[in-house]
Amino acid sequence: MAIERTFSIIKPDAVAKNHIGAIYNRFETAGLKIIASKMLHLSKEQAEGFYAEHSERPFFGALVEFMTSGPICVQVLEGENAVLANREIMGATNPAEAARGTIRSDFADSIDENAVHGSDAVASAEREIAYFFSTEELCPRTR
């Protein structure tokens, strides 16, 4: 199995409901190590840059507005097949379709405010990690 890194965001809705600790617990219980983490409030420019691939989609404006509506937590997770592992922990994008016991099933209210974001592939994880973290901010855990 491959040790990978993936990128994760705890979105404004989950931060506002004080679910940060519970979500971090899900990551760690699943064997993922948090090797970088910070809380920030995205500017409009940061949100537009991060979600640039969706700029022509009809939901782009609402997405940017939501992602700038309050603080978020961004983190880098490391572990065996981290991208897939995190996607399984998150559950389906639409919480109504998410399996019981997943983050979105337990903490999200709607497809628009669905608690978390996670990279969909190793390549996107690398790009997303670099958007928010310098190499010096990553703290590989050997113990």
Swiss-Prot record:
InterPro entries: NDK-like_dom (IPR034907), NDK-like_dom_sf (IPR036850), Nucleoside_diP_kinase (IPR001564), Nucleoside_diP_kinase_AS (IPR023005). It catalyses: a 2'-deoxyribonucleoside 5'-diphosphate + ATP = a 2'-deoxyribonucleoside 5'-triphosphate + ADP; a ribonucleoside 5'-diphosphate + ATP = a ribonucleoside 5'-triphosphate + ADP. Its cofactor is Mg(2+). It is found in: Cytoplasm. GO terms for biological process: CTP biosynthetic process; GTP biosynthetic process; UTP biosynthetic process. GO terms for molecular function: ATP binding; metal ion binding; nucleoside diphosphate kinase activity. ATP binds at K11, F59, R87, T93, R104, N114. SUPFAM superfamilies: Nucleoside diphosphate kinase, NDK. Belongs to the NDK family. NCBIfam families: PRK00668.1. Major role in the synthesis of nucleoside triphosphates other than ATP. The ATP gamma phosphate is transferred to the NDP beta phosphate via a ping-pong mechanism, using a phosphorylated active-site intermediate. This is Nucleoside diphosphate kinase. It comes from Shewanella sediminis (strain HAW-EB3). The gene is ndk.
